[in-house]
Amino acid sequence: MKLPIYLDYSATTPVDPRVAQKMADCLLVDGNFGNPASRSHVFGWKAEEAVENGRRQVAELINADPREIVWTSGATESDNLAIKGVAHFYQSKGKHIITSKIEHKAVLDTARQLEREGFEVTYLEPGEDGIVTPAQVEAVLRDDTILVSLMHVNNEVGSINDIAAIGELTRSRGVLFHVDAAQSAGKVEIDLQKLKVDLMSFSAHKAYGPKGIGALYVSRKPRVRLEAIIHGGGHERGMRSGTLPTHQIVGMGEAFAIAKQEMAAENQRIKALSDRFFKQVSDLEELYVNGSQTARVPHNLNLSFNYVEGESLLMSLKDIAVSSGSACTSASLEPSYVLRALGRNDELAHSSIRFSFGRFTTEEEVDYAAQKVCEAVNKLRELSPLWDMYKDGVDISKIEWAAH
C-alpha cells in the first residue's frame, strides 16, 4: 500500500489510464491534433469525427440525443451558461428563480449575480437530510418563475434529490428545470428520455476524465433557448464559442463510456468499501452522519466527530487526503454553509470530515484510514477539556462562557 492515501474523490478524480491513452493520441504531430472547425482538410475532419464520437459517448451515458450536448470548460461554466442563459433569454416572461441554500458555489454565486441584475431568487432550505422536496418547490413556484436550479447529488454530504418528481412538477407548470449533475454522472443512473429536465451540467474530472472540460445538456424537445455568455466563432451552435479541445473531449467521452459500462458493479464495490469503513469507526462515541442515511451515494461519507476540531483531525491524518466540512483551508473560519443549512450547530459543522471513495480505493486503504481516524479522534479527545466535561455529564450548551 502506498502512502499518502487519497480519499477525496468528491474533489477530483485521477484520470483513468484508458482515458489518458485516448487523449494522448490527439496531441502530437502524428496524432489527431487538427482543429475540429477546419472544414477544408482531413486533419479537421478527423478531429471533428473524434469530437462527435465524444459527444455521442456523453449522450449515451445519460440517454440523450448527441445534438443536446454542448461542450464547456467544466460544470462551473455549464451552470453559468444554463442559469444566466435562461435568465437573459426568458426575462420578458419573468424574473423569479428558485434554488437551494446547499447548491455548489457555481450556482449560488451565479444566482447572486442575477440578483444584482434585478432578478429575484428564492433559496430553499433543505431538510436535515440534505434533500429538497417537490412540495417545497411547489410552495414557492409563482407565475413569474422562469427557472428552478437544483443539484442531483450534493457534493459535501452525498444526498440525492428526487429530480424525477421535481421535474414532473416544473414541467406541468411550464417552468424550466436545471440540474447540476457534476456529482451524480457515473454514480447514479440518469435517463433524460424519462426525466423532465431541461438543462443538466456535467464535469469530466469528477468521473475519471480530465479537468477543464464539461458539458451542458440542453433539451431539444421541448426546445430550450439560451443566450450565450461566451461569444466568438459561433462554435456549438452559437451557444459556446471557442476552439474545441479535441483531446479533452475525447477524454470526457471515454470516461463517460467507461462509467456506463462499469457503474453498476463499481457502485456495489464502493458501497462495500464505504460500509466497511463506517463499521470500523462507528464505535466512536458522539459520531454523526451528515446528510441522508438512505437517499445517498455510497461514494461520499460525511461524518462529524463531536468535541474534535475538523482542522486538528485533518492535521492528525497527515497521510490521508480528506476534506474538512469547515472551510478553514480557504482562509475562513466559517463552518460549512451546507452543514449549517442542514441545521448542524457550529460545533458539529466544524468537526466534520468528508471521506470520499473511488475507483482506485482498496480495502487495505480503507482499513488503514479507519484505524488512523479512530486513533486520532481518541487522542484529540484526550486533550480536550470539553470532552472531559461532556464525560462528566456537564451540559456544555448551557455554559455561559466569559468574554475575554
Swiss-Prot record:
PANTHER family referenced in this protein's UniProt entry, alphabetically: CYSTEINE DESULFURASE, CYSTEINE DESULFURYLASE FAMILY MEMBER
Residues given in the record as [2Fe-2S] cluster binding sites: 328
Residue positions where N6-(pyridoxal phosphate)lysine is found in the record: 206
GO cellular component, one term: L-cysteine desulfurase complex
Protein name, entry field: Cysteine desulfurase IscS
Record localization: Cytoplasm
Primary localisation category: cytoplasm
Enzyme category, top tier: transferase
Functional pathway: Cofactor biosynthesis; iron-sulfur cluster biosynthesis
Sequence positions that bind pyridoxal 5'-phosphate: 75-76, 155, 183, 203-205, 243
Keyword list, A-Z: 2Fe-2S, Cytoplasm, Iron, Iron-sulfur, Metal-binding, Pyridoxal phosphate, Transferase
Cofactor dependence: pyridoxal 5'-phosphate
Role: Master enzyme that delivers sulfur to a number of partners involved in Fe-S cluster assembly, tRNA modification or cofactor biosynthesis. Catalyzes the removal of elemental sulfur atoms from cysteine to produce alanine. Functions as a sulfur delivery protein for Fe-S cluster synthesis onto IscU, an Fe-S scaffold assembly protein, as well as other S acceptor proteins.
Gene Ontology BP terms: [2Fe-2S] cluster assembly
Documented EC number(s): 2.8.1.7
An example Gene Ontology molecular-function term: pyridoxal phosphate binding
InterPro entries: Aminotrans_V_dom (IPR000192), Aminotrans_V_PyrdxlP_BS (IPR020578), Cys_deSase_IscS (IPR010240), Cysteine_dSase (IPR016454), PyrdxlP-dep_Trfase (IPR015424), PyrdxlP-dep_Trfase_major (IPR015421), PyrdxlP-dep_Trfase_small (IPR015422)
Catalysed reactions, semicolon-separated: (sulfur carrier)-H + L-cysteine = (sulfur carrier)-SH + L-alanine
Gene3D superfamilies assigned: Aspartate Aminotransferase, domain 1 (3.90.1150.10), Type I PLP-dependent aspartate aminotransferase-like (Major domain) (3.40.640.10)
Family: Belongs to the class-V pyridoxal-phosphate-dependent aminotransferase family. NifS/IscS subfamily.
Subunit structure: Homodimer. Forms a heterotetramer with IscU, interacts with other sulfur acceptors.
Positions annotated as active site in the UniProt record: 328
Organism lineage string: Bacteria, Pseudomonadati, Pseudomonadota, Gammaproteobacteria, Pseudomonadales
